[in-house]
């Protein structure tokens, strides 16, 4: 997670909950800074944020991690076209690094349009869309199965798995919900 908003000050420094989960579940012993080199205390990065978005730091960190591991998974930050404080989209860095993409779709009202636009944007940016994951964030969503079917028919990449609605999902083992055999 090279960049994270909604961080909190802790006794160990500024930390992000998702990055801490990634650090704890990494197959390699990595420092927090290797997992999350750029942090922001605000809800989002914005034009007036004091944190500097340095793509060089992100790229250097990616190279360092790639030298240590067979596979590096880079978690996104806020969506494909989210703007960083220098008003460049996060996707610009992903394109610069030519990273393949797995799209995570929060299954909720309006997600079909958002997911299809995001998938098309990733493809238009010239990156491979390796697959997508359905993340059920609303347990009461009507027509859940129909929504998944509509996305499967329209996203030009395989469904890698469905994460059911789970309270405290970050505290649970989720790997068994995914089939990443097509990615290996």
Task: Give the ranges of each region predicted by the language model.
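N-terminal phosphate/diphosphate-binding loop that engages ATP/GTP or pyrophosphate donors
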Residues: 1-52
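Phosphate-binding/switch loop-helix module in NTP-utilizing enzymes
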Residues: 42-84
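Short internal beta-strands
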Residues: 1, 102-105, 130-136
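Histidine-anchored nucleotide/phosphate-binding helix
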Residues: 88-95, 113-124
């Amino acid at each position: 997670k090279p960049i994270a908003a909604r961080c909190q000050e802790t006794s160990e420094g500024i930390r992000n909950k998702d990055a801490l989960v990634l650090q704890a579940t990494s197959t390699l012993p990595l420092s927090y800074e290797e997992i999350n080199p750029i942090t922001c205390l605000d809800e989002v990065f914005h034009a007036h944020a004091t944190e500097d978005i340095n793509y060089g730091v992100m790229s250097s960190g990616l190279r360092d991690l790639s030298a240590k591991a067979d596979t590096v998974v880079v978690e996104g930050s806020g969506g494909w076209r989210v703007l960083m404080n220098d008003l460049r989209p996060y996707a610009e860095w992903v394109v610069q690094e030519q990273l393949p993409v797995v799209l995570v779709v929060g299954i909720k009202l309006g997600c079909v349009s958002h997911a299809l636009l995001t998938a098309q944007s990733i493809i238009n940016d010239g990156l491979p869309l390796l697959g997508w994951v359905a993340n059920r964030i609303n347990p009461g969503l009507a027509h859940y199965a129909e929504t998944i079917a509509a996305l499967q028919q329209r996203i030009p990449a395989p469904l890698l798995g469905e994460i059911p609605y789970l309270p405290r999902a970050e505290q649970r083992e989720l790997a068994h919900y995914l089939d990443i055999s097509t990615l290996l």
